[in-house]
Amino acid sequence: DRSVSRGLGDVYKRQTVVISGSGNVAIYACEKATQLGAKVVTMSDSNGYVYDPNGIDLAYVKDLKEVRRGRIKEYAETHEGVTYVADCTKVWTVPCDIALPCATQNEINKESAEALVKNGCTVVCEGANMPSTPDAIEVYLANGVLYGPAKAANAGGVATSGLEMSQNSERLSWTFEEVDAKLK
């Protein structure tokens, strides 16, 4: 997030973000985007996605997915004004400024990338491992979409693994905030 922010200023502030997935990568991408001032409006699982125009209730999603091991559809059943769509591939048709694919490999194909561009997306930053097909990447580049490939976007995860090994070898326990500060 820091390298992107240096190039674009406050890239996340007041931006609408679409996220796929609801596992660790998606949850923490949602948390970071929200901390940086964005409004995350979607999360998904393999059965479908939820659209919350007021912004995702991350505390609920964390409880739903990490504690109760529920399905994302339950979010729509408990939150007023939320839409559930029983097709996770359609998450990329939701208008957004920033797309964070955090679910699975090859989840954004050419048609999905074209839908993102048509609906105003200007930034795609990959959280999942290779979520965009080569055809999708061509669409981003041809349309001036700022594209953060998984290799670059996940560098923080690799660095965090190194920090975790250091922490373990010294028998220390760092808070989330301490790890985040060390990454910066």
Walk through the language-model features, giving the residues of each.
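Single conserved hydrophobic/aromatic residue that forms the stacking wall/gate
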Residues: 1-8, 12
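Hydrophobic Val/Ile/Leu positions in short beta-strands of Rossmann-like dinucleotide-binding domains
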Residues: 12, 17-19
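General beta-strand structural signal in soluble alpha/beta enzymes
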Residues: 19, 42-45, 84, 100-101, ...
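Glycine-rich Rossmann-fold phosphate-binding loop(s) that bind the pyrophosphate
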Residues: 22
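N-terminal Rossmann-fold NAD(P) dinucleotide-binding loop
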Residues: 26-27
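NAD(P)-binding Rossmann-fold cofactor-contacting core
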Residues: 36-76
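A structured beta-alpha segment of the ubiquitous adenosine-cofactor-binding alpha/beta core
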Residues: 62-112
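Adenosine-phosphate binding glycine-rich loop
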Residues: 117-184
